[in-house]
């Protein structure tokens, strides 16, 4: 049998405008995903809200579907770019891609018989609830400490039966799907990345909770909810306070993660006038905060 391959093509951008140009060209040529990586040793720390700064030299990599013809794609790129950008190509065998991902992503238990696992993994625990996730378009598999802490809270401490939840910055949809599986009656999800909403919908269907999930392309479409979960960065958490408050009632709870320990004070400065703020978990320098109205 002939081995099938994914195709990775990488181009180097010298400035932010080139990054956007190359990303657009790769997507127009059929890339199913585009990622950025440093082409040197330069580091970028947390950017200002509303900005996406790049390295001085940025590798822009497109991942193309199985059995893509590299020569045809490169020809399309050259036509679109109008100049000769060096292109590095790499063929990734389908089996290697799947095997590498499965080796990296092992089943994770979060207590209360709840697991996150790939479709290929077998969970033998009796009465287990298993949230199935596979390689996809958006971030969020439960391996990062901030996501893991959110999941642990939803599974063990949130008492979600019959409640409404807003998963703000949903990524793969993992948190909202977990809430639905733990008994929430309605879960609203939003994200600034349209691919995240696509991934959330597909994952909700896979986990048979799609009837409870409501995707909001516009954040304002969600109503007031019992629990708002936001696993995003410090600056958006601070900047979005007014937006979050549109979706709260007097007894609502907010759960924030995506924060480092050293950032808690700044978050408190943005919320402490009207909210009681509790640190309820900490892992590997990341924290989970619970906010309730004073």
Curated annotation (Swiss-Prot):
Domain of life: Bacteria
Record has Transferase as a keyword: yes
Record keyword Iron present: no
Location(s), subcellular: Cytoplasm
GO BP terms in the entry: methylation
EC category: transferase
Signal peptide, first to last residue: none
Listed GO MF terms: protein-lysine N-methyltransferase activity
Keywords for this protein: Cytoplasm, Methyltransferase, S-adenosyl-L-methionine, Transferase
EC number: 2.1.1.-
Reaction it catalyzes: L-lysyl-[protein] + 3 S-adenosyl-L-methionine = N(6),N(6),N(6)-trimethyl-L-lysyl-[protein] + 3 S-adenosyl-L-homocysteine + 3 H(+)
Residue positions binding S-adenosyl-L-methionine: 147, 169, 191, 231
Transmembrane segments: none
InterPro entries tied to this protein: Ribosomal_L11_MeTrfase_PrmA (IPR050078), Ribosomal_PrmA_MeTrfase (IPR004498), SAM-dependent_MTases_sf (IPR029063)
GO (cellular component) term, any one: cytoplasm
Family from the record: Belongs to the methyltransferase superfamily. PrmA family.
HAMAP family: Methyltr_PrmA (MF_00735)
Role of this protein: Methylates ribosomal protein L11.
PANTHER family hit by this protein: ELECTRON TRANSFER FLAVOPROTEIN BETA SUBUNIT LYSINE METHYLTRANSFERASE
Protein name: Ribosomal protein L11 methyltransferase
Species of the source: Dichelobacter nodosus (strain VCS1703A)
Name of the gene this protein is made from: prmA
């Amino acid at each position: 049998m002939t081995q099938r391959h994914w195709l990775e093509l990488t181009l180097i951008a010298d400035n932010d405008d080139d990054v956007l140009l190359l990303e657009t060209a790769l997507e127009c040529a059929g890339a199913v995903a585009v990622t950025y990586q440093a082409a040197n040793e330069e580091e970028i720390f947390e950017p200002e809200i509303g900005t996406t700064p790049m390295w001085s030299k940025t590798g822009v990599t497109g991942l193309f579907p199985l059995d893509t013809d590299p020569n045809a794609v490169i020809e399309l790129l050259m036509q679109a770019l109008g100049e000769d950008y060096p292109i590095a190509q790499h063929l990734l065998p389908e089996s290697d891609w799947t095997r590498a991902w499965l080796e990296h992503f092992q089943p994770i238990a979060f207590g209360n018989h709840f697991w996150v696992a790939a479709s290929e993994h077998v969970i033998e625990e009796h009465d287990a609830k298993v949230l199935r996730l596979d390689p996809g378009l958006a971030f969020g598999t439960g391996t990062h400490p901030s996501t893991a802490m959110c999941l642990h809270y939803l599974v063990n401490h949130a008492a979600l039966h019959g409640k409404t939840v807003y998963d703000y910055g949903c990524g793969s949809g993992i948190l909202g799907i977990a809430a639905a599986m733990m008994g929430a009656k309605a879960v609203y999800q939003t994200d600034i990345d349209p691919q995240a909403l696509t991934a959330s919908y597909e994952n909700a269907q896979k986990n048979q909770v799609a009837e409870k999930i409501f995707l909001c392309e516009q954040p304002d479409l969600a109503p007031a909810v019992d629990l708002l979960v936001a696993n995003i960065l410090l600056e958006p958490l601070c900047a979005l306070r007014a937006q979050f408050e549109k979706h709260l009632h007097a007894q609502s709870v907010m759960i924030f993660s995506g924060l480092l320990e050293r950032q808690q004070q700044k978050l408190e400065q943005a919320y402490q006038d009207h909210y009681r703020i509790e640190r309820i978990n900490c892992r590997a320098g990341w924290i989970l905060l619970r906010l309730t109205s004073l």
